[in-house]
Regions:
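Generic detection of short hydrophobic beta-strand segments and adjacent strand-loop junctions
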Residues: 2-6, 108, 155-162
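Generic detector of contiguous secondary-structure segments
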Residues: 11-23, 108-121
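Canonical hydrophobic alpha-helical transmembrane segment
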Residues: 23, 59-79
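Short regulatory "switch" loops immediately downstream of catalytic or recognition motifs
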Residues: 29-40, 119-121, 132-141
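Conserved beta-hairpin
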Residues: 71-117
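A membrane-cytosol interface segment of integral membrane proteins
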Residues: 122-189
Length: 189
């Protein structure tokens, strides 16, 4: 059984995106602190936040603080998605397609794969996803990992990233084993 993983180029791209996401998260933390004038010391945080609120916050403080708060909460979810993409492995087996990444292991039976849908038709690096008949995230025992995986991928889809080595071979094997039709050719005649 062959396991398909990200190519070196795909890993570099994921690493660049990961560094960018961490930089955005650091900027959001710094901006949130400076906008509200609070202290991140755990012993002084609530007191400094309370003092800032009691002094009154203007719109010029509230709007950027809320935007930074959204980034502070959402960026770790993006980081998880990038890390899960970084270590993703797709293994076709006789039972179905096994997906493994960062402690997540899910087996998608061939009969559960309804379609392979093109999400991004970029000529150089197209992105496809498997459309599934149901939710198979229940196979993930850890509830935190199950939540993070569902946030990253959804419950009824599984992306097949553009940077996967021998990606077309994986797509052909999935279509053959799942009994799916080949997509219409997009080449000009």
């Amino acid at each position: 059984m062959k396991t398909y993983r990200l190519s070196a180029s795909g890993r570099r791209t994921a690493l660049i995106l990961l560094v960018g996401a961490l930089a955005i998260w650091g900027f959001a933390l710094w901006s949130f602190r400076s906008t509200l004038g609070i202290d991140y010391n755990p012993l002084a945080f609530w007191g400094s936040l309370r003092a800032s609120i009691e002094n009154g916050l203007g719109v010029s403080q509230i709007v950027p603080a809320l935007l930074m708060l959204v980034l502070i909460v959402a960026t770790p979810l993006l980081v998880w998605n990038l890390l899960e993409e970084w270590s993703a492995g797709y293994t076709p087996t006789s039972e179905g397609l096994r997906f493994q990444s960062l402690g997540v292991g899910v087996l998608y039976p061939w009969s559960a794969i309804r379609d392979v849908r093109r999400v991004d038709d970029d000529g150089d690096e197209p992105l496809d996803e498997l459309v599934l008949q149901g939710d198979y995230t229940g196979q993930i025992k850890n509830p935190v990992l199950r939540f993070l995986h569902a946030q990253a991928y959804g419950r009824t889809t599984l992306p097949l990233y553009a940077g996967i080595e021998e990606r077309q071979q994986l797509l052909d094997e999935i279509r053959t084993r799942a009994g799916l039709e080949e997509p219409p050719s997009t080449e000009a005649t």
